[in-house]
């Protein structure tokens, strides 16, 4: 799979911009704050409908404009599709081959993307919500049903929290309604847990070896953390129902649901030590890079497609050996789009085989193709 071209209108610092890419290596270079990261973000938003950098869609729209528009051609298995995304301050318009798509889950996964950017260090250093968001985004691409299940779960979670808030306000709550709600809630919770656990278990087959190849360190591991006893013979749903009963009085007092996948986490360890607490920044960066590169294998295993790899300023913090070790895991079948401020950081052979795209102030200055 590769992105053949993209058109960007009124997005961040891009007014009216279009560019084509080659199926293998593409390098976007230029000084800081010229739009390199914004272009990668535009590609990501076109595929995922949301930004990896911002939770607020309005920030994507160029100042003094009411809408942003993205359009790109994706090529896969000798076929092609045209994706379109319009972003206004109140809604999004999605199209595939000029046909409007109503459900986001029917749109996402038509362009499979893996992105690394400097702030990804927060995947290790930050709070659990960032890691849950990462899993949700990746699983939405891998499994067609995941986003629908997640949306159902979030609706049920909101309904349940609304009931619990009634206790806080001293209002009447129908306990039988809450009991029925709990059955639906725990059913969706188990589906989410199973897909997340399968995702993490599959990553574990690849990440430790990639981490060792890049960093030279052994002993890396991942763990999906949940409050459910995974060794128990009792089903996940039954255990979760029991925990909801156990925490019922506390939840009534606080007005929020205290257990479920919305509280789970993804943990990173090196030789048994929690990387968030004891890892160096370099080790944390290697962990995230290994995680992202392992995802390539998951897409190939599950979807029989190689995803598009977006690497934002990944080389500036790596020494020569680590840069070369990283590049060994990117083969010519993977379309890779890299941003850098310094071409000299890149291997000469890499540059020779790449399309070089020079960006300045949201405009194309030059483009040299192989």
Regions found by a protein language model. Give the residues of each.
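Structural recognition of the conserved hydrophobic beta-strand(s) that form the central parallel beta-sheet
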Residues: 72, 335-342
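Walker B catalytic acidic pair
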Residues: 312-314
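A conserved P-loop NTPase coupling/switch region
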Residues: 106-113, 117-183, 187, 366
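Conserved lysine of the Walker
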Residues: 36
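Helix-to-loop junction immediately C-terminal to a conserved catalytic motif
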Residues: 44
